[in-house]
Amino acid sequence: MAALQEKKSCSQRMEEFRHYCWNPDTGQMLGRTLSRWVWISLYYVAFYVVMTGLFALCIYVLMQTIDPYTPDYQDQLKSPGVTLRPDVYGEKGLEIHYNISDNRTWTSLTHTLRSFLAGYSPAAQVDNINCTSKTYFFQESFGAPNHTKFSCKFTADMLENCSGLTDPSFGFKEGKPCFIIKMNRIVRFLPSNSTPPRVDCTFLDMPHQALTPLQVEYYPPNGTFSLHYFPYYGKKAQPHYSNPLVAAKLLNVPTNTEVVVLCKILADHVTFDNPHDPYEGKVEFKLKIQK
Amino acid sequence: MVGGFSILLWVGAVLCWIAFGIQYVSNPSASLDSVYLGTVLAVVVILTGIFAYYQEAKSTNIMASFCKMIPQQAVVIRDSEKKVIPAEQLVVGDIVEIKGGDQIPADIRLLSAQGCKVDNSSLTGESEPQSRSSEFTHENPLETKNITFYSTTCLEGTATGMVINTGDRTIIGRIASLASGVGNEKTPIAIEIEHFVHIVAGVAVSVGILFFIIAVCMKYHVLDAIIFLIAIIVANVPEGLLATVTVALSLTAKRMAKKNCLVKNLEAVETLGSTSIICSDKTGTLTQNRMTVAHLWFDNQIFVADTSEDNLNQGFDQSSGTWTSLSKIIALCNRAEFKPGQESVPIMKRVVVGDASETALLKFSEVILGDVMEIRKRNHKVVEIPFNSTNKFQLSIHQTEDPNDKRFLLVMKGAPERILEKCSTIMINGKEQPLDKSMAQAFHTAYMELGGLGERVLGFCHFYLPADEFPETYSFDSESMNFPTSNLCFVGLLSMIDPPRSTVPDAVTKCRSAGIKVIMVTGDHPITAKAIAKSVGIISANSETVEDIAKRCNIAVEQVNKRDAKAAVVTGMELKDMSPEQLDELLANYPEIVFARTSPQQKLIIVEGCQRQDAVVAVTGDGVNDSPALKKADIGVAMGITGSDAAKNAADMILLDDNFSSIVTGVEEGRLIFDNLKKTIAYTLTKNIAELCPFLIYIILGLPLPIGTITLLFIDLGTDIIPSIALAYEKAESDIMNRKPRHKKKDRLVNQQLAVYSYLHIGLMQALGAFLVYFTVYAQQGFRPTSLFHLRIAWDSDHLNDLEDNYGQEWTSYQRQYLEWTGYTAFFVGIMVQQIADLIIRKTRKNSIFKQGLFRNKVIWVGIASQIIVALLLSYGLGSITALNFTMLKAQYWFVAVPHAILIWVYDEMRKLFIRLYPGSWWDKNMYY
């Protein structure tokens, strides 16, 4: 009970706190005199400077061990991701809705495509060489200027009807929209053994939806990524490299219904069956064209 | 303990759920991490609560025998009819009748009484029967003659009275409710844990709010800022510590139980360690609780007998003829007998039928002479007169075992002065000599000396009845005493005492050197109390009381300078007249105090007095009436063998062997657990910074999140649990029994130094080490450290599936997520590796690890092994389960933080070295925790 009587009043506590902040008898602030504070701060400054120095040293050593051209490990990029343009995300993944009769609903989509293809204009590709080979373009030496390697040209006109040059509306106006499919870059990745990787778009089977098979027109023809764009040697070796693209023009999309389109990349070393990653080797999107 | 700490955890859990609520409202696909975290926190609190309850219930079960009270009956006059009703049905105003032998059923004011005497010892400690009548004699109800009290006994006579108080309102009921009323005080360890919670909560909340403000200033969304705030607070809560502390305490409790200290209340384990005053009972605790022959006087010489527990080593000179006679008297003039069938039991442990002194004499002679029963058979007893309080002697006449000697032997023992009166000769060296004045003087000196030792002295004499007057056929009559009972031959004196337990003096010395004051509180006579106090060292050999000084200098007690005396013997009568201030002065000024003839209530007063000195008080007791003092004490210690159920119920700890030295073992364990808890907490707090930094860096510099909250839980509740328990097995660094008890307000469990050193030194080093592993993983996968800064928004975006790294490779959202988990695993492993170093450095606070020995505490290695195994299991075993956010980490990343771990060890060895080299220096003051 003796302990219970020691409850301090609020003012006492405040007084004690004030005394702690500044104790006039000993000249202590917050429990230390000024000189003590200087000493302890000096110690901490020194300690932290040394620790930061050591950490910086460790990072420096780490950076020295890193190869500038090829990452040490690529085990987490076994198979490339696939992306779609235009890319409009809804609650669950890509959702592209537009109304043919309302220009405003699809101009933003075509705008996305146009600005994406700006990187594939002949002017942007001026530093790249023309390739015609149907095999991998291996380069062991740094033959290009500035100790780099050559990259192959990919220009928007290779996408023909979906290049935006002949049809500025990319087919959106007539309900046969173009979608551009891009495969992610992975350093020194070889997608297949001999045949070039190919894009294949289908309607995703939905119950209670009897659909005629999807008809697609691919650009470049057959929807292939030519093998001479591979392997990719990294940003430092190929500063001007641009990903090859495939455009898919969907010809028979039913109007006023939401359909799910799945575009896979068919190649020996590209997998699309990872249950966790919806964008590995494939891209899936919902499409609803209204009239 | 459960209060403060689990509230912190509950707050954490609720915050998590709130965070999820907020996230869910803004984005219904929010991850369930916060829900898991909150649930786990809640489960942790509940589990540890159940665990602590189970631990205590286990101890409490032993108390199950309590509350079995025999229903008490009372004779009451109602409706002019005598009725017998249960005592609890009595009401105020009932007229009850009491007769000798009854227990008083309530507090009663007597209306009439015939020779009524009551035994008030359970209430006041007065062992003399008190007479009661109907007269009002004193203002104080305890003093007046016309009130009898509930639970006391009427010894003789009859009385009629009116009930004035029943149940809880009776005097003893008030004592009992006092006992339950004082039970709510917090134990010192609970106060320390609360203090620790304040520190942790303070750090968590202030860092959280600081970064909330920073986040808002950096134009983060307010909802995000709130989620950061919650994450920071949760990262700071040491989830596993509550369980660890409980386990550590129960481990110690188990260890103490092995050493005969049964701990009922887990927190009491530590309380004993901070004890600064022990108020010890005498009988049974300090002493063996059995009369034993201590001294003999014959041939004008005092001999010392062995009073140790086994009593076998009686090394005094037994060649004298006087001893032969004396031993015969001791063996023959004794009515006590061993219970049959105990031949295999050691003599001192055999059960005896007979009173305490006769038992002592029987065992004494059995040890020295061998089979006493056989001796008695050979010396056939003809007649005997048992001891009674008027005669004050005991006498028997025997045929002798010598077949040629037809004389009868008369043997007698009794109060020495009465025996001496009956003697005219004295035996010296086997020869009878006349008892002259000088011999009588020698007898008195010896008698006084033995009496002054607080011992009970008996005189022995014998007489061979002349064969002519008392032929073999003589018929002795004990009623008429037709034989001589004077002019006998005095043989010797023998004194007995309840001797101290042999381990006690050592234990008291240990207490002394440990800075614990031992106060004896006993109902016994002051002289006996003082003698025992001296022999066990409670009053040390060279210290004197005021009375001793007065006697030595031959001056009046009042003239003695009180400052000269180190010791004090205070009786209950003196204590009654003292004001609290005087008692405080007494307790403060005398290092050695004995309270004699004290009542149970006075025991409470003494305990309160000690607590006013800011002391942590341990009290030992066994009676019902001790229970308030036991409750009031910071730690009540009840006796396991002699203790009453009420005392055991009120106590926090039970000495299974009633032995004082067990308390000292308890103190040692208590101090050790305090030190080890300090180490455990330091160990646990350290990683909090390493767990907190990722969030801060994430908020300020926008790195991909280095470690997730679920992963944090696996450190707090996975890898760190066994190691922190292992620290409870650590041996003491130095002799912990050679330092003062900790001051309960100054020596905190978690002090500023501990927090600062753990957070700002080792914790920071750990954070840097863990970040190094994290950066290594990212850099080797393609993201250099510099590119990670301010990458957060792009990194966390689900809609960006071609994020470029430094090599121009493009990552999908899930690929990044997986890399992030690899980062979590790497950061986790970094912390784990450095926690091994942290565990090793925490083994000592001052000594070098090498002095303490790396391998003495095997459990530490079990802890380290468990850490590594759990981490390996998480990474390689569960790496494929994505919900746990672990991935299979490459082998070399496990070693990236090793240099940092070594650095931590080296730094801490340096700290300890400087502390040892420059004690009291600036370094010592700031770095020793």
From Swiss-Prot, chain A:
Where does the record say this protein resides? Apical cell membrane; Cell membrane
Annotated region immunoglobulin-like: the residues are 194-291
Question: What are the BP-aspect GO terms?
Answer: cell adhesion; intracellular potassium ion homeostasis; intracellular sodium ion homeostasis; pH reduction; potassium ion import across plasma membrane; regulation of proton transport; sodium ion export across plasma membrane
What is one term from the GO cellular component aspect held by the record?
apical plasma membrane
Keywords on record = Cell adhesion, Cell membrane, Disulfide bond, Glycoprotein, Hydrogen ion transport, Ion transport, Membrane, Potassium, Potassium transport, Signal-anchor, Transmembrane, Transmembrane helix, Transport
Q: Which intervals lie on the Cytoplasmic side per UniProt?
A: 1-36
As for PTM, the annotation reads:
N-glycosylation is necessary for assembly and functional expression of the pump at the plasma membrane.
| Short name of any one Pfam family annotated for the protein | Na_K-ATPase
Residue spans, topological domain Extracellular: 58-291
Q: Which GO terms describe its molecular function?
A: ATPase activator activity; P-type potassium:proton transporter activity
Mutagenesis / variant outcome for changing residue 193 to Q: Loss of pump ATPase activity
Q: What is its main location?
A: membrane
Q: What result follows from mutating residue 178 to S? A: Impairs the assembly of an active pump and its targeting to the plasma membrane
Please give the start and end residues of each transmembrane region: 37-57
Work out whether the entry's keyword set contains Transport.
Answer: yes
Q: Give the disulfide map.
A: 131-152, 162-178, 201-263
Highest taxon of the lineage: Eukaryota
Q: What membrane topology does this protein have? A: Single-pass type II membrane protein
Give the domain note: The C-terminal lobe folds into an immunoglobulin-like domain and mediates cell adhesion properties.
Q: How does it assemble?
A: The ATPase pump is composed of two subunits: alpha (catalytic) and beta (regulatory). Interacts with alpha subunit ATP12A; this interaction is required for the formation of a functionally active pump and targeting at the plasma membrane. Interacts (via N-terminus) with alpha subunit ATP4A (via the P-domain).
Q: What does this protein do?
A: The beta subunit of the gastric H(+)/K(+) ATPase pump which transports H(+) ions in exchange for K(+) ions across the apical membrane of parietal cells. Plays a structural and regulatory role in the assembly and membrane targeting of a functionally active pump. Within a transport cycle, the transfer of a H(+) ion across the membrane is coupled to ATP hydrolysis and is associated with a transient phosphorylation of the alpha subunit that shifts the pump conformation from inward-facing (E1) to outward-facing state (E2).
Family classification: Belongs to the X(+)/potassium ATPases subunit beta family.
NCBIfam families, per this entry?
Answer: Na_K_ATPase_bet (TIGR01107)
Q: This chain belongs to which protein, by name?
A: Potassium-transporting ATPase subunit beta
Please give the organism.
Answer: Oryctolagus cuniculus
Gene behind this chain? Answer: ATP4B
